[in-house]
Structures are given as C-alpha cells and as structure tokens.
Amino acid sequence: MTARKFETRRIGKTALEVTTLGLGCASLAGIFTGVPADQARATVGHALDKGLTYVDTAPQYGLGRSEHLVGDVLRERRAGVVLSTKVGRLLKPVPVAEQDKGAWVDPLPFNQVYDYSYDGIMRSFDDSLQRLGLNAVDIVYVHDIGAGTHGVEGNKPLWKQLETGGYKALRELRDGGVIKAIGLGVNEWEVLMDAFALGDWDVFLLAGRYTLLEQTSLDPFMTTCIKRGASVVVGGPFNSGILVGGATFNYAKAPEAIVAKVQALEAVCREFGVPLPAAALQFPLTHPAVCNVLPGPRSPAELDGILDWWDVKVPDELWTTLAAKGLLAPGTPIPSGMA
C-alpha cells in the first residue's frame, strides 16, 4: 500500500515534526457507541499505512482501553510515529457495578481520579507506558484541567497542584530527554493563557475552539502561541458532528444560531463545489500556529472518507468569500491575508 505524502510541520521549537493530519484515538475506545477492538486496531494500522505520523491517545479514553489498543499496533510499528498521551487522571480499579462509565460504552473496569501533582503526573506517565507496552512517548499533555471541566472552585486546588509540582514534573521529563514536548490538552482556550504564566510549553491540543464554525481562541490565545513559539494541534475539527451533517455541537444539541451559521457556511461551500467537511478539515491549517488537525475516525472506512475530504482542493476564493460574508472572525488568517 502506497503512503500519501503529507505536509509536515514542526512542533514548537522542538525537533519533532508531524504530518498535518493526525489520528485521534478517543472514538476508537467507544465513546457513545462501541467500536470492536479489531476494528480499532485496524484503524490505527490503516492510518500508518496511509502515511499519518501523529497518533494521540489518553488514559481517559475508554478508561485505559485506547492506550491498550494503540500500543497493540505501535509495539510493532513505532518507528517514525510521533505519539502523545495525557496526564492528570489516575485510573483506580473498581467493581463494574460501582464504575462511573461516563460516555464510554465498554470501558475497562476503572474509575478516574484527578491528580495534577508532581507525584500524580509521574504516576500517570508511568501507568500510560505500561498500558501502551512501550518505553517512551513523544508528547505529554496535561488533560482537561480548567474551569470548564472542574468548575471555577473545583479547579482551584487542581490548578495549585499543577502550579506547585505538576509543571515541575513535566519539565523534568522533557528537560531530561524522557519525552520531547509538553503541553495541555483541553476544550477551553482560557486555561491555556493561564498556563503561559507557569513557564514555557511546546504544543497545545485544543478541541473545538479553532474551527471553521468557531474561532473564539483566535485572540489572545493563538496570537500568544505565535509570540511564545508554541504550536497548536486542533482536535474536534467538526465540532462533534455539526460540520459533517450531524445535529450535535460540542456534544450537545446544536442551538438554532449555530445551525443557521452552519447552513450559511454550507451555502458558500456549495457555491465553490467544496464539501463542507473538506473545508472544515482544512481550515485550521491556514493559521501559522497550527501544526496538525486531529479528527477521530472509528474505522478504516471513516478514515478513507476523511482522506477524501483532505484531498479536495479548496480555492482561496472560498475563504475570501467566507470572510466577506462575516462568517470568519476578524483577523482570522486566510491565504490572501486576514479576514
């Protein structure tokens, strides 16, 4: 099977380079609907066959299931792959009857405990290596810290853990050469601005906040990334489904205003003969801070569909028209300049 040639971009100031399209492995762990293990492993293998070099997983995904599945494949195919996982959640074994499964259909028999302390970060990292069955990963993200996940008051002690010990652990891992890059993986850009006050970071995985539909993170976050030399991986490029014909926006029923904006985006795309999902997938890379777009297919067939959208030629005039109609935030980078 011939691998595609993808553009690669550098992660921050590190020596790491990734293909501009990556593989997010949350869906493979069975969020909302189950994914057979063989299908999940086949999807990871198919991504590598097609030339993708960046794979992202996390302890939370299937409460350990995703890391096991990803490790099953990468133990035989580690060369040339940039792998990221996340820290901040420890998995504790529990009887299935007492388990909080969340949105996972068939998770492994654990509950998650948040811990962003020095010891918690180190334990989480070691646990991930064991689940993966690997002796190294390349990137470690602090996962889901922030008021959006924990509430304003609930986040305060957790942030204190990161501030007083967790960040030190990450720096030790990176500066000691154990890992190559550190960052945060979250759904809210505001906490990333707080993170800049702790020190330097290499890359942030931000889900759903810099998409064709929503550019709320544009300023000050994305502009600060440029100034600080940090890269951005854009997760959730379809805003959980609304940009691929679904009815959900950020995992909830889409409000009428969002539906109306999607219809307006789709009308412009139709004018240029471009499928809306193709424009949504390619849009984030118009920003110079973005190094990778990270969709989460559930099968090799879904990945092939994503690759078809990736191959669509999007004319510069489409972005210019979106900007002229006020469908992109002012200051959004587009090939012709700024919206």
Where are these predicted regions, by residue range?
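N-terminal binding-site loop/beta-alpha segment at the start of enzyme catalytic domains
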Residues: M1-P93
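Short amphipathic alpha-helices and their capping/turn segments at secondary-structure boundaries
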Residues: R4-T14, E67-V81, I121-A136, S217-S231
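Beta/alpha (TIM)-barrel catalytic core signal, keyed to glycine-rich beta->alpha loops juxtaposed to Asp/Glu
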Residues: K5-R10, Q39, Q60, V73, ...
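N-terminal small/glycine-rich loop or linker at the start of catalytic domains
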Residues: K13-I31, V87-N111, Y141-H150, L243
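Non-cysteine beta-strand/loop elements that form the S-adenosyl-L-methionine
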Residues: V82-K86, D138-H143, S231-F238
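Active-site gating/metal-coordination segments in enzymes
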Residues: A97-I139
